[in-house]
């Protein structure tokens, strides 16, 4: 009977964790919190559960809890690529770029074929003003994510946006084009493409890209940003009625955001 009790105790936290993962994937956050807490009550050093609790805490705007869970996870298992990666992401999102670098580099070493640690390192070096290193890392991230997918599209959008900031407009547009091929539902990709085409004077093709962006879910790029861009594009296309309509929508969206 002792071995049966031991087996039940061992399986218990794993079952709670698996249920928490399912709830998290289905965006049932209160249920996921309950399950992950149950897993950690039975197994306080369960690294995957600590990482999941940290991610849930981030959604709940509890950075103190997220940081504590991730540091506990790394203390329990310094070789956890997932824990190192999410600690780096945590610091990146807190704009603490110097602290983000070390765990992201560790995650990259632990999982050299994963594009995500390299991608976040690229954005971190970009934020710190190290353009040369950022360019190299963005290219590495792109090379590690060759398949057309929403993940590769996100990498290409960020890469293209960085190239745009460096004045490499044609290269930027090419990244945006490939991002759209990878994820036609990416609002950010269509917006960045519209912005690039507008800069290059291709207003006729920029307008439909901006209009397409407006039809997609608002995750990163806001409605206000797109309306402002389209207002300027339609002015250049000598379509004042459309320009005026988008300008009014830009003002309305901006007021809504400020409330």
What are the residue ranges of the model-derived segments?
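Hydrophobic alpha-helical targeting segments used for export or membrane insertion
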Residues: 2-11
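Helix-start (N-cap) detector for alpha-helical repeat units in TPR-like alpha-solenoids
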Residues: 12-14, 47-48, 81-82, 97, ...
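Alpha-helical segment of the N-proximal tetratricopeptide repeat
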Residues: 12-42, 52-55, 59, 89, ...
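Structural signature of tandem alpha-helical TPR/SEL1-like repeats
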Residues: 25-35, 57-72, 94-106, 128-140, ...
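Structural marker of alpha-solenoid helical repeat scaffolds
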Residues: 42, 76, 110, 144-148, ...
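TPR/TPR-like (Sel1-like) alpha-helical repeat modules
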Residues: 198, 211-218, 224, 228-257
């Amino acid at each position: 009977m002792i071995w049966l009790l031991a087996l039940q105790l061992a399986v218990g936290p794993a079952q709670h964790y698996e249920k928490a993962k399912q709830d998290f994937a289905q965006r049932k956050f209160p249920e996921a919190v309950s399950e992950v807490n149950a897993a950690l009550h039975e197994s306080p050093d369960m690294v995957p559960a600590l990482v999941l609790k940290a991610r849930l805490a981030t959604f709940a705007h509890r950075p103190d809890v997220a940081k504590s869970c991730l540091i506990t996870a790394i203390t329990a298992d310094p070789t956890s690529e997932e824990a190192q990666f999410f600690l780096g992401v945590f610091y990146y999102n807190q704009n603490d770029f110097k602290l983000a670098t070390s765990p992201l580099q560790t995650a990259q070493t632990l999982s050299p074929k994963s594009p995500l640690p390299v991608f976040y390192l690229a954005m971190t070096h970009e934020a710190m003003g190290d353009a040369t290193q950022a360019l190299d890392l963005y290219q590495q991230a792109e090379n590690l994510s060759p398949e057309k997918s929403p993940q590769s599209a996100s990498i290409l959008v960020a890469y293209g946006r960085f190239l745009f900031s460096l004045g490499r407009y044609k290269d930027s547009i090419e990244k945006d084009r490939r991002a759209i091929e990878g994820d036609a539902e990416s609002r950010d990709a269509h917006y960045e493409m519209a912005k690039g085409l507008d800069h290059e004077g291709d207003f006729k093709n920029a307008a439909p890209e901006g209009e397409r962006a407006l039809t997609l879910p608002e995750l990163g790029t806001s409605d206000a940003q797109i309306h402002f861009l389209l207002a300027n594009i339609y002015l250049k296309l000598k379509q004042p009625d459309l320009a005026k309509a988008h300008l009014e929508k830009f003002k309305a969206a901006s007021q809504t955001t400020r409330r």
